[in-house]
Amino acid sequence: MARQINIESSVSQVTFISSAIPAVSSSSSITASASLSSSPTTSSSSSSSTNSNFIEEDNSKRKASRRSLSSLVSVEDDDDQNGGGGKRRKTNGGDKHPTYRGVRMRSWGKWVSEIREPRKKSRIWLGTYPTAEMAARAHDVAALAIKGTTAYLNFPKLAGELPRPVTNSPKDIQAAASLAAVNWQDSVNDVSNSEVAEIVEAEPSRAVVAQLFSSDTSTTTTTQSQEYSEASCASTSACTDKDSEEEKLFDLPDLFTDENEMMIRNDAFCYYSSTWQLCGADAGFRLEEPFFLSE
C-alpha cells in the first residue's frame, strides 16, 4: 500500500515537471519574442533621430544659403528711374561705398543711389551721379522723407540745408534727391572757383611781373651806364693830368736862345736846337802852338 502511494507521488512529480517545462519554454519564448519585438523599435527610433538631425542640418544650410543670396541680390532699374519693373542682378558687396550709406559704384565709375521703401521689398531709384558725395546727398533727402528724424544720414550736420519733397511719393522723392545733388555740385564749384580766385589775387599777374622785370632791367642798365661813364671820365681825367704833367716836363724854356746862348759860348760844347756842335766849328779848329816834328 505504501509502495503504491510512493509510485503515485513520483508519477505526479514527473507530470508536474513535464508540465512546467513547456511553461518555462513558453515564458522564454515570450521573453525572446518581446526582446525581438523591442529591438526593431529601438533601431527605428535611433534611425528616426538620425534622419531628423540630418533634416535639421539640411534646413539650416538652406537658410544660410538663402540669406547669403538675398544679401547679394539687389534691385535696380537701368532705363526707368521710377523704380518700377527693375532688373534683378547679383552684385558684389565690394561695390558699396565704405563710408556713405545707400551708395554704390557701377562698373564704369559712376555712383548710384537708392533706398528701400519701408515694409516693402522694392527700392526707390534716386539716380546716377558722377561723385559719391552727390549720391550720398540724394540718399539723405530720401531717408529724411521716408524715416524722418530716425533716419541715418551721411551728412547729419547739413540736414537743414536739404530740400524736402512735396509728398512721400517716389517721384517727389526722386525730384528732391536730384535737386539736392545738383545744389551740392554747385556749392562745390563755387568753393573751388573762390579758392582759385584767392590764389590768383594772391599771386601777381604775368603783366605785372613783366613790367617789374623790365623796370628792374632798365634801372640796372642805367646804373651800369652811369658807372661806366663815371669810370671813363675818371680815366680821361687821369690821362689829361698825365699829359699835362708830360707837357710841363717837355715844354721847358730854351736855354740856348738869345742871352743864354751868349752866356755859354765859352763852354767846350754848346747846344743848338737839339744839335750838339763844337764851339768855333765854323772857323775851324786851330792850335795856338805849332807842332814840332822830330827828325
Swiss-Prot record:
Subcellular locations according to the entry: Nucleus
GO biological process: ethylene-activated signaling pathway
PROSITE patterns associated with the record: AP2_ERF
GO CC terms in record: nucleus
Coiled-coil stretches: none
Biased composition (Low complexity): 24-53
Region (Disordered) residue spans: 24-102
Main location: nucleus
Gene3D superfamilies: AP2/ERF domain
Entry's transmembrane regions: none
Designated name of the protein: Ethylene-responsive transcription factor ERF034
Organism: Arabidopsis thaliana (Mouse-ear cress)
